[in-house]
Amino acid sequence: MEDFVRQCFNPMIVELAEKAMKEYGEDPKIETNKFAAICTHLEVCFMYSDFHFINEQGESIIVELDDPNALLKHRFEIIEGRDRTMAWTVVNSICNTTGAEKPKFLPDLYDYKENRFIEIGVTRREVHIYYLEKANKIKSEKTHIHIFSFTGEEMATKADYTLDEESRARIKTRLFTIRQEMASRGLWDSFVSPKEAKKQLKKDLKSQGQCAGSPTKVSRRTSPALRILEPMWMDSNRTATLRASFLKCPKK
C-alpha cells in the first residue's frame, strides 16, 4: 500500500500526509491504510477548491487557466493540510474578518461565497452513515458537511452540494480511479476491512523495500491549491527534487 500511495498521489500531497501523521506520532510505513486515506482526503479538498474564484461582483466563477487578473479572489480558503497551529491561526483570522462562529473542531475549508466552514468527508462505507457520524461529532449547524464515497455517491447538508456538477464529477471520477487502481493490486479489500488490513500489513512488512508495479494513471498535475500551500512548507529546491524522483520505481 505504501508503494501505491507514493506512486498514485502527487509528491506534495504525500509529503503533507506524512507531516500530518508524524504530528500525531503515527508512522506512514506502518499505518499504510491511514496514509492512503489521508492522501485521498487531501486530494479531494484540493480538487474541491481548484479553479473556483469570486469576481468583483461577488459571483462565483470557474477559471481553469492561470489568470493575471488580480481582482479575482479564491473562493475557498484551504485549512486542511496545514499544521494545527497555522490552521487555527487561519480559522481565527477568518472568524475575526467575517464574523463567522468559531468551530469547535478544525474544518477543511472556508467558503467565502456562502460564508461558511466546510467539513469534507471521504468514506469507504455508506455515505449517510458517515454523514451522521460527522454531524454528531461536529454538533454545529454552522459547519457545512459534504461527504463523497468511492462508489460515486455523495451527501451534503440540506442537499446543498456547493459545487457545480462538473466539479463534483471530477472528484468522483478520481475516487473511482483510486478504487480501481487499489483493486487491481489486491489492496482494496484491506483498505475497507480492518481484518484484511492486518493481513496486508504483515505482507507489507515482509516485502518492504520492494517496488510495486506503476499505476496506469498517475496524478502528475500540481493542484492550484497546492501551489498556494507549497511556499508555506517546502522550498522550491525540495519541490524540484521531489518532482524529479516521482515514479522512480523501475519497471519489471
From Swiss-Prot:
Gene3D superfamilies: Influenza RNA-dependent RNA polymerase subunit PA, endonuclease domain (3.40.91.90)
InterPro entries: PA/PA-X, PA/PA-X_sf
Entry annotation: catalytic residues: E80, D108
Subcellular compartments: Host cytoplasm; Host nucleus
One GO MF term attached to the UniProt entry: RNA binding
Any one GO BP annotation for this protein: viral RNA genome replication
Pfam families assigned to the protein according to its UniProt record, in alphabetical order: Flu_PA
Domain of life where this protein originates: Viruses
Keyword annotations: Decay of host mRNAs by virus, Eukaryotic host gene expression shutoff by virus, Host cytoplasm, Host gene expression shutoff by virus, Host mRNA suppression by virus, Host nucleus, Host-virus interaction
Site positions for Important for efficient shutoff activity and nuclear localization: K195, K198, K199
Site positions (Important for efficient shutoff activity): K202, K203, K206
Swiss-Prot/TrEMBL domain comment: The probable endonuclease active site in the N-terminus and the basic amino acid cluster in the C-terminus are important for the shutoff activity. The C-terminus acts as a nuclear localization signal. The C-terminus is recruited to host protein complexes involved in nuclear Pol II RNA processing.
UniProt function note: Plays a major role in the shutoff of the host protein expression by cleaving mRNAs probably via an endonuclease activity. This host shutoff allows the virus to escape from the host antiviral response. Hijacks host RNA splicing machinery to selectively target host RNAs containing introns for destruction. This may explain the preferential degradation of RNAs that have undergone co- or post-transcriptional processing.
The family this protein is said to belong to: Belongs to the influenza viruses PA-X family.
Annotated protein name in UniProt: Protein PA-X
Source organism (scientific name): Influenza A virus (strain A/Japan/305/1957 H2N2)
Gene name for this UniProt entry: PA
